[in-house]
Amino acid sequence: MTQPSFQDHYPDIFAHCYGCGKLNEHGHQIKSYWDGEESVCHFMPKPYHIAIPGYVYGGLLASLIDCHGTGTAAAAMYRSLKEQDPNTQPNTRFLTASLHVDYLKPTPLGVDLEIRGKVKELKGRKVVIEEWILANGIITVRGEVIAVQVPESMVEELVKGKQ
């Protein structure tokens, strides 16, 4: 993708997450984008993301659902604002309040994983995202993230701590 991802717009104070932080050199650094009304992210598991030979371990899959969901929540909230500048992207941050994952089939290693999400509910500071992971076009995982917007008081506390 040529446009910036949702995560590219996170303020640096919120860009350290292992799953989606652009400033975490050891993390996954996932990149999520809009594809119509759905969000999409691609991730290629490394050989060390193994569960049993040939298959991805469930913790990685949960992490992908988690971080793609919070990124989608931030982008969905931003998209819903009437005063948004169409040439900008979200810089708000959301955190996981609830994560539910259903493992439907073993997910193979060595193939590009496609993570997709869709906004199920957007109300106040809460966004519910339904998601699924595809391997070779087959849904292997379904999940749901309930994400809440980071309170301004937490942002202020983090900024103070950096000074």
Residue ranges and their predicted role:
Residues 40-76:
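A conserved, well-ordered hydrophobic junction motif at loop->secondary-structure transitions
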Residues 29-31, 102, 116-118:
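Short, surface-exposed charged micro-motifs
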Residues 1-8, 105-163:
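HotDog/MaoC-like acyl-thioester-processing domains
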Residues 43-45, 103, 149:
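Hydrophobic residues in beta-strands and at strand termini
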Residues 1-53:
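Non-catalytic linker/capping segments at the edges of enzyme domains
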Residues 72-114:
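Hydrophobic beta-strand-centered segment that forms part of the acyl-chain substrate-binding groove
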Residues 67-69, 76-83, 100, 135-136, ...:
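Low-complexity, flexible helical/coil segments
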